[in-house]
């Protein structure tokens, strides 16, 4: 979601910057260098960047300067891992701000904290939970991606709704009508689409999924 300038108090936006900047720097340090040095891996990152940039521009405007968009976090984490996902998704926010004027410089850190960092943490936790607690079979892998995308979208919905209710003075009825319902519906659609995409990747490009291993999920080893 893109928050307009002046919608939240300055201290909350500053808190977003305090959280986002160290997290992005840590992601730069921890990300796997093969995603930047290898031709195939670089192509994969570029494809994710272009696809999500296009999807983010297909946003639903709620009020002037305020819009919601697809997240694609769970699928991105499954493809490149959490640290690279943070870099790619944060870069998309910066790219859209500079090239399309989507968002605002003062709210960039808050947007990254809520629309990138929080969903990536949730996606990683869901992946680890399913990996260790459920059988490692392909249908479970598909279900994990769909469930994770839905939970990521709803988590962002819950946090931003709480902030809106607490600090913005935005009427609660309009929050439900214009914001919460839209994100809930988008979460469901994103879960279905992500499940289809990951099914195609498992069948044709499993090498693009760093969290998928043929020996574990197909051969049962």
Where are these predicted regions, by residue range?
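Hydrophobic alpha-helical transmembrane segments
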Residues: 42-50, 86-90, 109, 113, ...
């Amino acid at each position: 979601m893109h928050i307009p300038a002046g919608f939240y108090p300055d201290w909350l936006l500053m808190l977003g910057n305090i959280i986002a900047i160290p997290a992005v720097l840590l992601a730069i340090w921890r990300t796997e260098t093969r995603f930047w040095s290898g031709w195939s891996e670089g192509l994969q990152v570029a494809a994710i960047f272009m696809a999500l940039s296009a999807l983010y521009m297909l946003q639903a405007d709620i009020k002037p300067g305020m819009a919601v968009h697809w997240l694609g976090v769970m699928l991105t984490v499954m493809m490149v891992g959490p640290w690279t996902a943070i870099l790619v998704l944060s870069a998309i926010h910066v790219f859209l701000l500079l090239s399309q004027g989507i968002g605002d410089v003062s709210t960039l850190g808050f947007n990254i904290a809520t629309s990138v960092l929080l969903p990536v943490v949730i996606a990683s936790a869901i992946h680890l939970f399913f990996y260790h607690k459920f059988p490692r079979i392909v249908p479970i892998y598909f279900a994990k991606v769909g469930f994770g995308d839905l939970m990521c979208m709803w988590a962002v919905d819950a946090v931003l709704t709480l902030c809106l209710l607490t600090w913005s003075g935005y009427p609660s009825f309009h929050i439900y009508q214009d914001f919460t319902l839209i994100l809930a519906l988008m979460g469901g659609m994103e879960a279905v689409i992500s499940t289809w995409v990951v099914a195609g990747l498992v069948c044709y490009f499993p090498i693009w999924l760093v969290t998928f291993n043929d020996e574990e999920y197909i051969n049962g080893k």
